């Protein structure tokens, strides 16, 4: 297995899937992809080759972005924007009470 079992958290009313493993400084991984893409290749599992290796030194979290993978779609169409995606990402960090996380994206 290259990832842990998925977890889900409510982020401002949007059910959000993520993976969480390891101990240490938080390292949050955000995948690439287009807003609202139905392609499951654009999800947190993009990080599967790096995830467990990184968890040896960090608490590593990989999250499905807003409207991608198994994270729900935005609550309104006006959130299908980059700012809506960033708001959701920040909401994810707040919901998990992550202070000063390291962030990686592609």
Language model features by range: what are they?
Residues 6-8, 20-25, 94:
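A general secondary-structure boundary signal
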Residues 5, 57-58, 100:
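A generic structural signal for alpha->beta connector loops
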Residues 1-15:
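N-terminal cap/lid segment of alpha/beta-hydrolase-fold proteins
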Residues 48-52, 62-104:
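Active-site loop/oxyanion-hole signature of alpha/beta-hydrolase fold enzymes
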Residues 8, 60-62, 106:
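Conserved beta-strand scaffold positions in the cores of enzyme catalytic domains, especially
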């Amino acid at each position: 297995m290259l990832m842990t079992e998925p977890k889900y958290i409510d982020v401002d009313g949007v059910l959000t899937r993520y993976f969480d493993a390891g101990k240490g400084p938080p390292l949050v991984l955000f995948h690439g992809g287009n807003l609202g893409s139905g392609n499951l290749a654009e999800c947190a599992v993009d990080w599967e080759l790096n995830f467990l290796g990184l968890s040896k030194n960090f608490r590593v979290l990989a999250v499905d972005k807003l409207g991608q993978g198994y994270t729900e779609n935005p609550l309104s169409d006006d959130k299908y924007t980059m700012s809506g995606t960033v708001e959701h990402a920040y909401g994810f960090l707040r919901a998990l009470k992550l202070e000063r996380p390291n962030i990686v994206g592609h």
